Curated annotation (Swiss-Prot):
InterPro entries: Peptidase_C15, Peptidase_C15-like, Peptidase_C15-like_sf, PGP-I_bact-type, PGPEP1_Cys_AS. Its main location: cytoplasm. Removes 5-oxoproline from various penultimate amino acid residues except L-proline. HAMAP family: Pyrrolid_peptidase. The gene is pcp. It is found in: Cytoplasm. One of its GO terms (biological process) is proteolysis. This is Pyrrolidone-carboxylate peptidase. It comes from Cupriavidus taiwanensis (strain DSM 17343 / BCRC 17206 / CCUG 44338 / CIP 107171 / LMG 19424 / R1). It catalyses: Release of an N-terminal pyroglutamyl group from a polypeptide, the second amino acid generally not being Pro.
Length: 216
């Protein structure tokens, strides 16, 4: 039975919870078609997070990997297009590290694109009633760090054998209550969005060609 690996992060920056972990763990063990979802938590720590996802790739040998992270301030589920080879941390990670203008992989490519049908995923998430969009930046904190590390590792595999990408998600309502004016999505909406994204990624190899860009 094929495995779909979903990863979420531990809480960071004084948050008591991280919506990425709450959402992915709700799907742990669920079957989508003939595949089964396995959810695992990553540390919000530079270096250690890439090491952890690498170990999961070795032990689980998934057919599909979607890493998920918190993006407080965003109003939609953001399916990321590209990971860039730089750490530039506005805040320290959970181990106190704050790399500035540091390559994630020395002499690695400047960027990697997700190998998921990102526009088809957004289309189907919206059709399911979930606010979603294509995002052109995963930031320069641990989320982008993991996204780049994941894609660098998957680049070793024969093309198309293991596909991967990243989805950013908004705060949960209980977090937004601590950050007045910030948008949020209910946990059940986030779970529905991830379930839909997984189903589309499993069933769709070639992405749709439709508008998904931004002017700025």
């Amino acid at each position: 039975m094929p495995t779909v690996l979903l990863t979420g992060f531990e809480p960071f920056e004084d948050e008591p919870i991280n919506p990425s972990w709450e959402a992915v763990r709700a799907l742990d063990g669920e079957r989508v078609g003939d595949a089964v979802i396995v959810a695992r938590q990553l540390p919000c720590v530079f270096g250690a997070a890439i090491d952890a996802i690498g170990e999961l790739l070795d032990t689980l040998r998934p057919a599909l990997v979607i890493a998920v992270g918190q993006a407080g301030g965003r109003a939609e589920m953001s399916v990321e297009r590209v990971a860039i080879n730089v750490d530039d941390a506005r805040i320290a990670d959970n181990a106190g590290a704050q790399p500035i203008d540091t390559a994630i992989v020395a002499d690695g490519p400047a960027a990697y694109f997700a190998t998921l049908p990102i526009k088809a995923m957004v289309r189907d998430m919206r059709a399911a009633g979930v606010p979603a969009s294509v995002s052109q930046t995963a930031g320069t904190f641990v989320c982008n760090h993991v996204f780049y590390g994941l894609m660098h590792r998957l680049a070793r595999h024969p093309a198309g054998t293991v596909r991967g990408g990243f989805i950013h998600i908004p705060y949960l309502p209980e977090q937004a209550a601590r950050h007045p004016g910030q948008p949020s999505l209910a946990l059940e909406t986030l779970v529905k969005g991830l379930r839909t994204a997984v189903a589309t990624a499993l069933s769709t190899r070639a992405d749709v060609r439709e508008q998904g860009g931004q002017l700025h």
